[in-house]
Amino acid sequence: MSNRVIIFDTTLRDGEQALAASLTVKEKLQIALALERLGVDVMEVGFPVSSPGDFESVQTIAKTIKNSRVCALSRALEKDIDAAAQALSVAEQFRIHTFISTSTIHVESKLKRSFDQVLEMAVGAVKYARRFTDDVEFSCEDAGRTPIDNLCRMVEEAIKAGARTINIPDTVGYTVPSEFGGIIQTLFNRVPNIDQAVISVHCHDDLGLSVANSITAVQHGARQIECTVNGIGERAGNCSLEEIAMILSTRKGELGLETGINAKEIHRTSSLVSQLCNMPVQANKAIVGANAFTHSSGIHQDGMLKAQNTYEIMTPESIGLNRNNLNMTSRSGRHVIKHRMSELGYGEQDYNMDVLYEEFLTLADKKGQVFDYDLEALAFMEAQAETDDHYKLQQLVVHSDSTEGSATATVKVAVNGETITEAATGNGPVDAAYKAVARASGCEINISSYQLSAKGEGQNALGQVDITAKYREQNFHGVGLATDVVEASAKALVHVMNLTWRADKVADCKQRIQQNKRELGGV
């Protein structure tokens, strides 16, 4: 049996299900490219039949990704498989992933069928998917609670039908490692054609055991792990990709297993997913948390000074978190910024140097020294910018009355190239700024959540504001970044306004297409 574990990333499918606001196609493509750099073997990027937006994002990613296999999910229904195949047809290499529930509670309560009927549907779906590709994965949903005789029978028949990967999910995160390892071992002992497929596992974290269950599974013969960056996902989340990658790397001598993951891309990928998904990483999160390589105990610090491996089983550098002694100030030239971006893992194609350097100088003039996290934050915001923004914040001036708690904001907002100046009074500076921007733009946005975080340390740290806003029954996520919290808040609002403007344009375009179809049909 091979010692290579296939890493199947489902950040853009299962992970996205946890988000308050859906990612845009551009944001999904950014994450897909980061996953490709990270070295994932397979990336599951959506559920094409679920919506036109999901279909478009799967198709866009499938056209772009070259080094990872692109996968799409489908139920055990021909219409789902057709949509997946159509969206993936432009990919250099792709996989169709079809699934159906197999546990008694799901079969009887959700599907309201007999197990034999479900088995027939599964076999039919695998055979149908094989018409489009040899790479078909089949999942036994809620396998962790499926009677073992039924599970063995389902796996055997799915392999006979042509599935080349069989996924055993712990869908509700219910099993413990000894139990889950036993399920995998039983499949290898009792399914006669098990050697004709790769056994995969997909573990949820409801009891905090997703990583432990996944490691136990590969110790018992599974050779694919399904996971997400930062462990994001439905309910309590999924198995964490970075934890799996570093466990298999750090304990390679004991486990004898390896992956194709480029660990030096872990920190960068984790940060990107956290920012785009508006899901901060908890400080004590293994591998990528802010405290993962921080030592505060005097005894620990003393040991670290004597020998780093006294209290570190891996280094920050191993996940791409470099210790940098290079001071970047307003006197730093373009070559310094380019060199530092290269050391941080960014290629010239990942950012616009002219825009980034201009933003860097503005920030350096404000705070003096610019750090790595500042530079990465600026690169992130530059990557989010669009050339066709309908709204642009040109100026913001705020006056606050600390005795009454009121504030007045004056803004200049460019609306389709025309500058409009407005002022408003509000209950604090952020409220005043939002009211002024709304007046200037004529765009009313209902904000459902507001989150402020610091990007860096000290009083000059960049502030990042993430807002979720509801517009026409849809959630949109906006991000703003500035050393001034009120300015960051206004930028986040303008970001959302541009997203809603584009959504309206798309809706109008679809309406015109439908109208043209109706008119042509009536001729």
Curated annotation (Swiss-Prot):
Cofactors: Mn(2+)
Describe which pathway this protein belongs to, using the record's wording: Amino-acid biosynthesis; L-leucine biosynthesis; L-leucine from 3-methyl-2-oxobutanoate: step 1/4
This protein's GO CC annotations? cytosol
By its UniProt entry, which Pfam families does this protein fall under? HCS_D2, HMGL-like, LeuA_dimer
Cell location: Cytoplasm
Superkingdom assignment:
Bacteria
The GO annotation for biological process reads: L-leucine biosynthetic process
UniProt: Mn(2+) binding residues: 14, 202, 204, 238
Stretches that traverse the bilayer: none
Domain Pyruvate carboxyltransferase per the UniProt entry, residue ranges: 5-267
The record, for PROSITE patterns, names: AIPM_HOMOCIT_SYNTH_1, AIPM_HOMOCIT_SYNTH_2, PYR_CT
A GO MF annotation of the entry reads:
manganese ion binding
Keywords from the named record? Amino-acid biosynthesis, Branched-chain amino acid biosynthesis, Cytoplasm, Leucine biosynthesis, Manganese, Metal-binding, Transferase
| EC number, UniProt record | 2.3.3.13
Major location category of this protein: cytoplasm
Question: What S-S linkages are listed for this chain?
Answer: none
Q: Which family does it belong to?
A: Belongs to the alpha-IPM synthase/homocitrate synthase family. LeuA type 1 subfamily.
- What is this protein's function per UniProt? Catalyzes the condensation of the acetyl group of acetyl-CoA with 3-methyl-2-oxobutanoate (2-ketoisovalerate) to form 3-carboxy-3-hydroxy-4-methylpentanoate (2-isopropylmalate).
Name of the protein: 2-isopropylmalate synthase
Q: Which gene encodes it?
A: leuA
